[in-house]
Curated annotation (Swiss-Prot):
It holds the Pfam family Inhibitor_I48. Binds and inhibits cysteine proteinases. Inhibits most strongly papain and cathepsin L, more weakly bromelain and cathepsin B while it is completely ineffective against cathepsin H. GO terms for molecular function: cysteine-type endopeptidase inhibitor activity. The keyword Calcium does not apply. It comes from Clitocybe nebularis. The lineage of its organism: Eukaryota, Fungi, Dikarya, Basidiomycota, Agaricomycotina. This is Clitocypin-1.
Length: 152
């Protein structure tokens, strides 16, 4: 399974059943420190807040950090709690597993490396918020949220 190279990316919300939905879409957008990460169109005023640094760590997991201008401190994808539909928070960057979606080259499922009995904890979208979703580890559960990583 190919791993994502370290770099600067925009993250577009897609699904495993429709990894290339065409023009438009919503992108992971920072609102501010300790605020929920939003899903917004890639247009002003959101465009400048959709740039993320992905860094793979020695353990094979990755951090996703906001790479904006004039950032007073480092923050990225984080959480206060890993409950169903809890928001992804822009906070102290946590580690995630980036799992390539089969038959794609740039679409990944973002999973929290947390052991929950029988479920994977994945980053999806609800309304215009990035949230944590639970899916059965056996792969059932239908269409899953995924993210197209477009290099800047």
């Amino acid at each position: 399974m190919a791993s994502l190279e370290d770099g600067i990316y925009r993250l577009r919300a897609v699904t495993t059943h429709n990894p290339d939905p065409g023009v438009g879409g919503e992108y992971a957008t920072v609102e501010g420190a300790r605020q929920p990460v939003k899903a917004e169109p890639s247009t002003p005023p959101f465009f400048e807040r959709q740039i993320w640094q992905v860094t793979r760590n020695s353990d094979g997991q990755s951090t996703i950090k906001y790479q904006g201008l004039n950032t007073p401190f480092e923050y990225g994808f984080s959480y206060d709690q890993l409950e169903q539909n809890a928001p992804v928070i822009a906070g102290d960057p946590k580690e995630y597993i980036l799992q390539l979606v089969p038959s794609t080259t740039d679409v990944y499922i973002i999973r929290a490396p947390i052991q929950r009995v029988g479920v994977d904890v994945e980053v999806g979208v609800q309304g215009n918020n990035l949230v944590y979703k639970f899916f059965p580890v056996d792969g059932s559960g239908g269409d899953r949220p995924a993210w197209r990583f477009t290099r800047e």
